[in-house]
Amino acid sequence: MQKVSRRHKENFERTKNIVYSNIDEAIAVLKETATTKFVESVELHANLNIDPKYADQQLRTTVTLPNGIGKQVVIAVLTNEENFEEAKSSGGDIVGNDELIAQITQGQINFDLLIATPNMMPKLAKLGRMLGPKGLMPSPKSGTVTSTLQSTLTEFKKGKFEYKADKTGIVHVNFGKSNFTNEQLVENLKALYQSIEQNRPSGVKGKYFKSVSICTTMGPSVKLDLEIFA
């Protein structure tokens, strides 16, 4: 069993049983407890009053945070050959059609996001079982099936990404890195919370948010008072 360091224990004791009502203080504590030697991801965990087994209580949407999330996304584009140049000049890292489908079929998935033009979707249908579980299957709802490659690629290169609630109704999503400034993390956190709030499923009855906490990859949970966003 891996030994837990004294600093690690101290960090968890520091935030245990505390609910932070000041967003600046919460972010400061979050950064102070990110004590590993590598740059950690910063995560939000929002427990929502939804039951995703019902269609009108599902949450799946996209957001562009003001300061990005500190990750360079590799984007693959599946389109006709006449669109290759536009796709490449607009930020597509991997561009192709039938040969790209063949690579994916062989398990060569060297990208974080797949964008496709509508005419390519019938060819992609057979790969749904491979791409779906990885969250890589293009869909109109996520904006990854598009006829406007230039604007779509520009948005995703700027940091647009998709998030969704899991089957228990909890949203787990990164909103930055531990080396971001406090101000950048505050701005991103507020924007992400606002996005979740604005995309409240129509079937939600009563209170929407049950609880919200933030943490770094190896750090303790920092619980937030929901009034912090009022």
UniProtKB/Swiss-Prot annotation:
Compartment(s) where it occurs, according to its Swiss-Prot or TrEMBL record: Plastid, Chloroplast
CDD domains in the record: Ribosomal_L1
InterPro entries hit by this protein: Ribosom_uL1_bac-type, Ribosomal_uL1, Ribosomal_uL1-like, Ribosomal_uL1/biogenesis, Ribosomal_uL1_3-a/b-sand, Ribosomal_uL1_CS
Name the record gives this protein: Large ribosomal subunit protein uL1c
Biological process according to GO: translation
NCBIfam families cross-referenced by the UniProt entry: rplA_bact (TIGR01169)
Function according to Swiss-Prot or TrEMBL: Binds directly to 23S rRNA. Might be involved in E site tRNA release (Potential).
Keyword DNA-binding: no
Molecular function GO terms recorded: rRNA binding; structural constituent of ribosome
Family: Belongs to the universal ribosomal protein uL1 family.
SUPFAM superfamilies: Ribosomal protein L1
